[in-house]
Regions:
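Active-/binding-site microenvironments in catalytic and ligand-binding cores
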Residues: 1-177
């Protein structure tokens, strides 16, 4: 769903969403399983002196990619919340990415919180932000440090066109001049 309309399938995603200015937000200081709140995003944007523009592609660096291929990868990194995701999408962001296993916090942290309070809204809350405002997210990104700057680069991330699919592969590239 997207504002009450059926969600776009991967073959319906407008290509202009997938080639745009990039911005890299650094949250490597946050603990594994910690929430990246809208206030955190605002603070980071202030630190790097950047104002989000429509169709910016926002990349979130948690440091989780350093654990790729290791069992602990699945529990590494902070994760976005519904609130922080909506903060970005309300500004016109349509594509985001993260270097962790999921756009949300790692699953064991979600499961533990659900076990403690029984509130199903903690499960995939950032994913479900797309029900209110549609967006696409890339997960398991790597080498975000190689970009070398927080803005002033272009991201190209065209998805493989699979008819009717809710997701697809992408090979994202940051073009740094």
């Amino acid at each position: 769903m997207d504002r009450g309309m059926p969600a776009a399938t991967i073959d319906e995603i407008p290509l202009e969403w997938c080639f745009s200015n990039g911005v890299l937000l650094d949250f490597r200081h946050k603990a594994d399983g910690e929430r990246i709140t809208a206030q955190d995003v605002k603070r980071e944007l202030g630190r790097i002196k950047y104002e989000i523009k429509p169709l910016d592609i926002v990349l979130v660096q948690t440091g989780a990619d350093a654990f790729w291929g290791k069992p602990e990868y699945l529990i590494k990194g902070a994760g976005m919340t519904k609130e922080s995701t909506l903060f970005l999408t309300e500004k016109g962001v349509k594509v985001v990415g993260i270097d962790a296993w999921s756009w949300d916090r790692p699953l064991p942290f979600l499961a533990e919180e659900f076990k403690q309070n029984g509130d199903p809204k903690v499960i995939w809350e950032a994913h479900f932000a797309g029900i209110e405002i549609g967006y696409c997210h890339m997960e398991k990104m790597a080498n975000l440090s190689a970009i070398g700057r927080s803005s002033g680069f272009t991201v190209c991330c065209f998805p493989v066109k699979i008819k009717g699919a809710s997701a697809g592969w992408v090979r994202p590239v940051a073009i740094v001049d």
